[in-house]
Design a protein with these regions (language model features):
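Extracellular loop and loop/strand-boundary signature of outer-membrane beta-barrel proteins
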Residues: 45-51, 94-102, 159-165, 244-247
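Residues that define the transmembrane beta-barrel architecture of outer-membrane proteins
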Residues: 31, 55-59, 105-109, 130, ...
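Outer-membrane beta-barrel "beta-signal"
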Residues: 110-114, 250-291
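Repeated loop/turn-to-beta-strand initiation elements of outer-membrane beta-barrel proteins
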Residues: 72-75, 186-189, 267-270
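Gram-negative (and chloroplast) outer-membrane scaffold detector with strong preference
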Residues: 73, 78-150
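Residues on the lipid-exposed face of transmembrane beta-strands in outer-membrane beta-barrel proteins
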Residues: 37-39, 63-67, 111-115, 136-140, ...
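Outer-membrane beta-barrel strand-turn architecture
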Residues: 29, 67-71, 117-121, 142, ...
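Short glycine/proline- and aromatic-enriched beta-strand/turn motifs that initiate or cap beta-hairpins
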Residues: 21-66, 145, 252-258, 262-268
Length: 291
């Protein structure tokens, strides 16, 4: 997946250099389709952060496309790779005694709609120098929480550290706001912040309130990663009755903050493709000449 995103970024970076020999006046016909690349930070909200706070800032990278339906409304699609991390050692209350931690590499694909505060202008190059927008949509998330033990990294979901199964593919609802800054007729900079509501409490592999009975867990690795209090001598004599592991009443979520470069694609790209496609179709359906 990382290689796919890198290849996509290289392709997007090359687009502005295609057809640069033509003047602006030759290309000023309206453009409604944009491509983008961006980067920023991601942070998560769940059991391994202080109440009302977010976790450590981790990097993300995104590619996307956007189409303007009219001067205010647009539809967009984005593919984002990001990391999340949580650690009880950073807790400012008694949760440090739980001694749990996780890190994960995640992939999100989302389809969203955006609305601008002010119209973009009759032509794309007549848009205002600064505009504010809001967006919302729906997406799908792949996440894979992992933890280290004795110098090795283990994926937690297959181990079922709480004795429960859950899917690593979940729907998400992204919502957020942003600002669009015009660099020149063809380029924008977006500064955006968006929160993702999820339908799972397992981004960090922690959910149930009480520790599970060790006898129901798969193996010794699962048992050790399920209850890590013995590593710092905080384990009670009866772990299934004493101590809180998670909070199943609240779902996990994450926040993405990005700076994105957008480029308006010329219509000639699509027109040339249509001409080539139609030419091939005509050649395919052309009847053979009689001898």
């Amino acid at each position: 997946m990382k290689k796919l995103i890198i290849v996509g970024l290289i392709g997007l970076l090359a687009i502005p250099f295609v057809g640069n020999s033509q003047s602006f006046f030759a290309l000023r016909r309206d453009r409604n389709f944009l491509v983008s690349i961006g980067t920023g930070t991601a942070t998560y909200k769940g059991e391994m952060v202080n109440p009302g706070d977010f976790g450590s800032l981790r990097p993300n990278i995104a590619i996307g496309a956007e189409y303007y339906l009219n001067s205010r409304l647009s539809a967009r699609a984005e593919l984002t790779y990001f990391q999340l991390r949580g650690d009880d050692k950073k807790a400012d209350d008694d949760r440090w005694q739980r001694n749990l931690s996780f890190k994960s590499g995640n992939v999100e694909f989302a389809v969203m709609g955006a609305i601008n505060l002010s119209p973009m202008g009759v032509r794309f190059y007549q848009r205002s120098a600064f505009n504010i927008h809001a967006f919302a949509g729906i997406g799908v998330l792949y996440f894979n929480p992992k933890a280290e033990l004795d110098g090795k990294t283990y994926a937690l979901q297959p181990l079922q550290t709480e004795g429960k199964k859950y899917s690593r593919i979940q729907p998400v609802i992204p919502v957020g706001i942003g600002a669009r800054i015009k660099l020149d007729p063809f380029f924008n900079i977006l500064v955006e912040g968006g929160y993702r509501f999820t339908f799972t409490d397992y981004l960090d592999d922690v959910s149930i309130r009480r520790y599970p009975d060790p006898s129901i867990l798969k193996n010794d690795i699962a048992r050790r990663l399920s209850d890590r209090r013995p590593e710092i001598d905080t384990q009670p004599s009866r772990p299934t009755e004493v101590g809180v592991r998670g909070n199943p009443k609240e779902k996990d979520g994450y926040l993405i903050l990005n700076v994105t470069l957008q480029y308006y694609l010329p219509k000639m790209i699509f027109q040339n493709y249509n001409k080539l496609y139609n030419t091939k179709r005509k050649g395919y359906y052309r009847k053979p000449r009689r001898s």
